[in-house]
């Protein structure tokens, strides 16, 4: 589980953080100052990368949260086996079996290159690369 730590005030929409043990992408972030002597609070709405669950968090802006280290890679489709696809990583040449995302079912074909991410021990195909 590769993570690093950052303060909430450094986070922006579109960045990633760990909520509920899952790597999540921030969809909205807002801050509010409660009053004269209170610390500013941040409300974060995020969606899980791998499970698509909505999560929210309310904490002071100077609180620390875990940030997942996300590795974006490129692989070539070797074989399509029903609902799964077998990829070969183009850097390490290792083969990986991953499920095909619903939105990419028609786009993935043998020999095509796809981008996939690896974070916290999970992998997911994100998109197909153009030109193939």
Swiss-Prot record:
Family: Belongs to the eIF-5A family.
GO cellular component: cytoplasm
Protein name according to UniProt: Translation initiation factor 5A
InterPro entries, A to Z: IF5A-like (IPR001884), IF5A-like_N (IPR048670), NA-bd_OB-fold (IPR012340), Rib_uL2_dom2 (IPR014722), Trans_elong_IF5A_hypusine_site (IPR019769), Transl_elong_IF5A_arc (IPR022847), Transl_elong_IF5A_C (IPR020189), Translation_prot_SH3-like_sf (IPR008991)
Known function: Functions by promoting the formation of the first peptide bond.
Residue list for modification Hypusine: 36
Organism: Methanosphaera stadtmanae (strain ATCC 43021 / DSM 3091 / JCM 11832 / MCB-3)
Localization (cell): Cytoplasm
CDD domains per record: S1_aIF5A
Record GO biological process: positive regulation of translational elongation; positive regulation of translational termination
GO molecular function, one term: RNA binding
Keyword terms of this UniProt record: Cytoplasm, Hypusine, Initiation factor, Protein biosynthesis
Pfam families recorded: eIF-5a, IF5A-like_N
Superkingdom, natural source: Archaea
